[in-house]
Amino acid sequence: MEKRVAVIGAGISGLLACKNIMEKGFNPIVFEARSGIGGVWSRTIESTKLQTPKSFYQFSDFAWPPSVTETFPDDKQVMEYIKAYAIHFNILPRIRFNCKVTCIDYVLHGNEDFPSWDLWGGTGWPFSPTGRWNVTVQDARDPTAPVEVYQLDFVILCIGKYSDLPNIPDFPLNRGPEVFNGKVLHSMDYAAMANDCAADLVANKRVTIIGFQKSAVDIAAAVANRNGVDHPCTLIFRTVHWIVPDYFLALTLKSLNRFTEFMVHKPGQGFFIWLLAVLLSPLLWIFIKLGEAYLKRKQPLKKYNMVPEHGFLKQLSSCIFTVLPANFYDRVEEGSLVLKKSQSFNFCKNGLVIDSEETPIATDIVIFATGYKSDEKLKNIFKSSYFQKCITESLAPFYRECIHPQIPQLAILGFADSPAILYTTEMRSKWLAHFLAGKFKLPTIREMEDDVKKWEKCMKYYANERYKRSCISALLPIYCNDQICKDMGFNPRRKKWLLAELFAPYCPDDYKYLCWQM
C-alpha cells in the first residue's frame, strides 16, 4: 500500500523535501498557507539580497542561470531561481495553495504506549503499522469554510523560523505601544508590504528601528538612504554584533575546509581528534583575532562605540550572520542614521524613552526587528501537549538537525540555522528521502538523545550563553555532511585529490551526484 507523505510549507525547505522524496517514488501532498511558493523570499524589503555567495546558495543539481552574474543576487533573482527549480522538477502540481495547516495530531491504534518505545516509531523505520498523523487543514481564504482532515503516514514540517509569529517585547502598563501616537509594526509586516507602499510609509517620517541583526540594519540603512539628515532614522539595540562586509563573510565561508575543521572540537571525538584540535586551536585563535583586527581597522567601530564585547568565533558559533549594508557608517557619519545602545526602553506619547537618556526620542514610526518566536510556532502546530513539551522543554538539537527522538513519523526541515541555509537543508532533505525509502534505520531513541546531547555540549563550548539548538553546524558543516553521507552509505570524501580534500571549501556542487548514487 502506498505511503502517504505530507510536506507542510512551500518555501525552500518544502520544495527540497518534495523534490527529493518524489525521486524516491513517493507522491507527497504539499500544503501551503499562501498563494505562492518561496517562503520568506516572497516577502522581502526592496534592498534585500543574498548574504551568502551564490556558489554556496544553490541547489546541487540545478545551477544558477548564466544571466545571474552577481556574486550576491537580489531578492527578485532569488525568487526567479526558486520558481525555475520548482517548475524544472515538476513540484508545483504537488502543492495545494491557500491550505493552512492548523494542527497535527498523532493517532496510535492499539494498546501501544509510544513514550515507552526504545526505537523511534516503535521500529526505527519511517513508517509504523499502527501510527498515523491527522493533519487538519483550513482554507486560508475562507476561515468559515469546513476544515478537512487528512490521515498521513509521515509528515515533514517546513513551516519556517522567520515568519508568522513575531517576537515583540512586553512592556509595563502604560509604557507600551498603547500610549504612543505613532505607528508600530514588526519587520515582518514591513517586508510584506509592496515596495512603493513601504517607501511611502517611511518617507519624510522619523523612524526608529529596534534590533541589530539582518532585518534591523537593512531596514535602518534603507530608511536612512531615503530620508537623509532631515528625517534621521534611529537604530536602538541592546547588544552590538559584528556586522561584516559581504566579501568578508564570503571569505569566511570559503575558509571552512577540512583543515580548519581540524581546529574545532567535535562531539564524540576520540583522543587523536581531540589532541589535534588542542594543538591547532591557537591557529584558529590567530585567524579569528586577525579577522577582528581587520574589521576594527576598516570600520569606525571604536569611534561609534560599536566594538562587540564578544569574539567573532562566538558569534559565528551562534549563527548570527549580519552583512554590513553599503554606506552604513557613511549614513551614521552624516547624521541620517543615529545609533543608540540601550538595555531597555519604553514608549511615551510622542516617541521612545531609553534608559540612558532623559529626553524622549521623537518618533513617528517604530519598527520592531526583534526576530520571531520560532519554538513557539513549532510547538503550536501540535495538538498533543506531550509533543508540545518535547519542543519547548529541551534545548538539545534535533538528531541530524531534522528528527526529534521523541516525535515519531515526523521530520522538521529548515529549522537549522547556517550561513548557507539552502545548502544545509538540501543535505538533510537528501538524507530524509533515503530514510523514507528504507535505505537505513535510525538508532535507538536513547542513542539519538545521547548524540544530540554531545552536540549540545560541544556547541556550548564555543557559543556559551549564545548557544541555540538550531545552530550546531556553523563551525562543522563538512563534518555534519560526512555523518549524513555515512548514514546513507556514501563516501563522504567528495574531492578528487588530497590537497583539495584538505584545503578546498565544500560547496553544493560537491554533492551534485549524491542523489544518483544507490
Question: Where would I find each of the regions flagged by the language model?
Answer:
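A catalytic-pocket lid/entrance helix-loop region that shapes and gates access to the active site
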Residues: 242-272
